[in-house]
Swiss-Prot record:
Family named by the database record: Belongs to the DmsC family.
Subcellular location(s) of the protein: Cell inner membrane
Topology versus the membrane: Multi-pass membrane protein
Its job: Part of the SoeABC complex that catalyzes the oxidation of sulfite to sulfate. SoeC probably anchors and stabilizes the catalytic subunits.
GO BP terms in the entry: anaerobic electron transport chain
Record-level GO cellular component terms: dimethyl sulfoxide reductase complex; plasma membrane
Keywords: Cell inner membrane, Cell membrane, Membrane, Transmembrane, Transmembrane helix
Membrane spanning residue stretches: 5-25, 43-63, 87-107, 126-146, 165-185, 186-206, 266-286, 290-310
GO molecular function: dimethyl sulfoxide reductase activity
Subunit and interaction comment: Forms a heterotrimeric membrane-bound complex composed of a catalytic heterodimer (SoeAB) and a membrane anchor protein (SoeC).
Protein name, as recorded: Sulfite dehydrogenase subunit C
A Pfam family hit: DmsC
Organism of origin: Allochromatium vinosum (strain ATCC 17899 / DSM 180 / NBRC 103801 / NCIMB 10441 / D)
InterPro entries, A to Z: DmsC (IPR007059)
Length: 325
């Protein structure tokens, strides 16, 4: 498939924004459970603002993928059958909850609303945090299922697509939370850094499983089945047209297989071992710069990973354009 940069930035920015928001809520839940010291409300408010800006940037990137942006609102009409429509509906809900969560913390609306059990007092920020967490997880699923639900693109049609979007997005968000904490000198950098490492390693396991699965795929369609010829050796000599077309532009990435393999190595290094090593090194030497570097290195790797994700999908129609695709 053709990797559109608008969709690459959409998915990576949304993932980082959702992940950062989940990191803020996780930190608050740990503080409520007294596993972490309580933080100033402004800490969560600023973190939520950054998460909201990432979500807005991702939404803005999506408009560059539309032929008629003024009709974007119609994308929500098919919510009963379309994961894209569901994403269009869930995204503004997530953005509204992130905004409300940040505002509630900024104005310190922390008076208890009700009590659960003997000790847990639920205030507005905690309630919004839980609702936002549920919505964010739903958004991860909706975004990933846009691709995982496409049956004829066998590289995508697997639950591993959903796990990749979830864990890689969460890892980048927690890595950003560690960078944010390091930048302002907050001691939670260790907490967020540790969670970022855990999520990164889980994401590595998921991505490697996805790559291994795709390497063993047996495609249902071949040249023989496409044209109804049983001969063992069928080779296309020409695509039947003298120039390119929509089919050759939109359903093929136009790069060599060797480039894909090199990029795969690059993103596997940038997304996984380097950030983990940088976080570990920051613990040893007490550097506040290394978590920040770790986030930017990982995010750059995620852009390459997402490009490769789209490029790896082999559309069956390319059987008719083998001299190009």
């Amino acid at each position: 498939m053709h990797p559109a940069f608008s969709v690459i930035f959409l998915t990576t920015l949304l993932g980082a924004g959702q992940g950062l928001y989940l990191a803020m809520v996780t930190g608050q839940l740990y503080a409520v459970a007294r596993f972490l010291p309580a933080q100033a409300d402004q800490f969560y408010a600023v973190g939520s603002l950054v998460a909201l800006l990432l979500l807005i940037a991702g939404l803005g990137a999506s408009f560059f993928h539309l032929g008629r942006p003024e009709r974007a609102w119609r994308a929500a009409a098919m919510w009963r059958t379309s994961w894209l429509s569901r994403e269009v509906i869930v995204l503004p809900i997530v953005m509204a909850l992130v905004f409300a969560y940040g505002v509630a913390h900024w104005f310190e609306w922390t008076q208890p609303l009700f009590q659960v059990g003997a000790a847990l007092q639920v205030d507005l920020t905690l309630l919004l945090g839980v609702l936002g967490t549920i919505a964010s997880l739903a958004l991860f699923v909706c975004t990933a299922m846009i691709y995982a639900a496409v049956r004829f693109l066998q590289e995508w049609h697997t639950p591993l697509t959903v796990s990749n979007f979830l864990f890689l997005g969460a890892a980048s968000g927690f890595m950003l939370a560690a960078a944010y904490s390091a930048y302002i000198g907050n001691p939670l950098v260790t907490f967020y850094g540790t969670w970022a490492v855990i999520l990164t390693l889980v994401g590595l396991a998921s991505r490697l499983a996805h790559l291994r699965r795709n390497a063993r795929l047996k495609h249902k369609s071949t040249v023989q089945t496409a044209i109804g010829v049983r001969h063992a050796s069928v080779v296309q000599k020409a695509q039947g047209a003298t120039g390119g077309s929509f089919n050759t532009r939109e359903f093929f990435h136009g790069r060599s297989q060797s480039l894909l393999e090199r990029l795969r190595t690059v993103y596997l290094v940038l997304v996984f071992p380097i950030p983990v090593l940088l976080i570990g090194l920051s613990y040893l030497i007490g550097s506040s710069n290394l978590p920040i570097i770790a986030f930017f290195v990982q995010f750059a790797g995620l852009l390459i990973e997402r490009w490769s994700f789209f490029a790896e999908a082999r559309h069956p129609q390319n059987l008719y354009y083998q001299s190009v695709a």
